């Protein structure tokens, strides 16, 4: 679960149209959210308030080993009007989970002029007690595609009482580049990420027979690398990663595959993540070292539950002009009286007068039945007669259904076969609070008995 300050930072990025998924450090963010999610340790309570559209404050208190806490402040040069408190915020925005990667869309001229004129910036600071530890962050937009990010930590337990990291980032639709400097070990880094893919697959085939249009659209291949050099110790660093994201036009379900390589230490990591339904996601990760031949398999999933479990409010595509999903069909078979007004036909998508089939499927059920008549180029097709409304693609409807779903909680589970670790996490809404509780279990290598590594609960409240 994001802290309130992290949530405001993401809202700031959305307001300024900054694509976080286009940054190299986030290339494996989806698998990390499903496999490496943090477990609360002890008791923690977080109370936050956005006093104005430009500023917010947060107070945190916990009892991990001892009573400690922190006080944080945040200021934004642009109004953060797209934020919500814990009572109204959707769990999709408050909890790290599956990220649907799609081609970036350029800024509108109105928003671009506004951003360039204001030179948007964000200031953040946090003070910890007891003790004298401080942390700060500055985000300064230089142009519409570049920004300066500075992170500082002051702690008497660190070497030279602290460290500072400076990021100079350039983020466009096709690529992103980062130049990084850290005072720790005089570390210098360079990160690059390039996107290979089409912004709109269907628009690139206006003169091609619709029958041969690929069954996947919005596919994006991202290739990135990072280079590091520690000047003080003269130590190099290198890694490369690849991410493939796509969404099936038959079901609308997205999937993401990644491959990360560190040639210096010989480590290879591959992940496969798929959103199996609107409320569930599955992820697998395989690690292998070419030098030691050590390997590890990690599995994880997340399962959302709906806030209202009444049968008449079962989530459906009835407001989206596509056919029902398999889960809805199971429900409709038990209630035949609802089938009459439930389904609506798939309408063809028109592009410059040439009909392009987005999803040539009719009678979508647990078994898909392809309708060859939809693949015909005949202009007298029944699907062309009704042009009163513009239907959306299955991929867009699935994404909209995920965004519009009212979830009350999410259950996360992950395990690692080689490490013999099990993590269980529950996050949800309790009255006006967001609650996160979980446990981390591991197998004692000597006694072969399970033992608790972490166990805790945290409450978050924000106005």
Swiss-Prot record:
Q: How does it sit in the membrane?
A: Multi-pass membrane protein
GO cellular component labels: ERMES complex; SAM complex
Q: Which Pfam families match?
A: MDM10 (PF12519)
UniProt-annotated location(s) = Mitochondrion outer membrane
Record's keyword terms, sorted: Membrane, Mitochondrion, Mitochondrion outer membrane, Transmembrane, Transmembrane beta strand
Q: Name one GO biological process term.
A: phospholipid transport
Q: How does it assemble?
A: Component of the ER-mitochondria encounter structure (ERMES) or MDM complex, composed of MMM1, MDM10, MDM12 and MDM34. Associates with the mitochondrial outer membrane sorting assembly machinery SAM(core) complex.
* Family, similarity comment: Belongs to the MDM10 family.
Q: What does this protein do?
A: Component of the ERMES/MDM complex, which serves as a molecular tether to connect the endoplasmic reticulum and mitochondria. Components of this complex are involved in the control of mitochondrial shape and protein biogenesis and may function in phospholipid exchange. MDM10 is involved in the late assembly steps of the general translocase of the mitochondrial outer membrane (TOM complex). Functions in the TOM40-specific route of the assembly of outer membrane beta-barrel proteins, including the association of TOM40 with the receptor TOM22 and small TOM proteins.
Domain comment quoted from the record:
Lacks alpha-helical transmembrane segments, suggesting that it resides in the membrane via beta-sheet conformations similar to those predicted for other outer membrane proteins and porin.
Q: Which PANTHER family match?
A: MITOCHONDRIAL DISTRIBUTION AND MORPHOLOGY PROTEIN 10
Q: Which HAMAP family match?
A: Mdm10
Q: What is the protein name stated in its UniProt record?
A: Mitochondrial distribution and morphology protein 10
Organism (species): Candida dubliniensis (strain CD36 / ATCC MYA-646 / CBS 7987 / NCPF 3949 / NRRL Y-17841) (Yeast)
